[in-house]
Amino acid sequence: MNKGKHHARSFHPPSVADVDQLKEHAGIAACKFVEDGMAIGLGTGSTVRFSIIEIARMINLEGIEIVGVPTSESTRRLAESLGIRLMSLEEVGKLNLTIDGAD
């Protein structure tokens, strides 16, 4: 081994496809906390989009019932288009869980 000689590791940022896949995994993983009967705050962003799609799948295939409270108009439109029942925060009163991202 050559002492004093450092081999620099090159850093390669993840590709857009890799980032999208990581966001999908994170969005789906967040849904592991979703339970039947919950009122769920639905955030906004590219990662939460995957969560909303997963929640719709859970409603349709697993038969869970939840109420979503969207944080934006775009989230409302997506959730409605996927058949997620929505209410306002005033109607729900208290959220059991909120799913949001950092983007």
Q: What do the PLM-derived regions correspond to, one by one?
A:
Residues 2-6:
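N-terminal nucleotide-binding beta1-loop-alpha1 segment
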Residues 7-102:
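N-terminal active-site beta-alpha-beta segment that forms phosphate/nucleotide-binding
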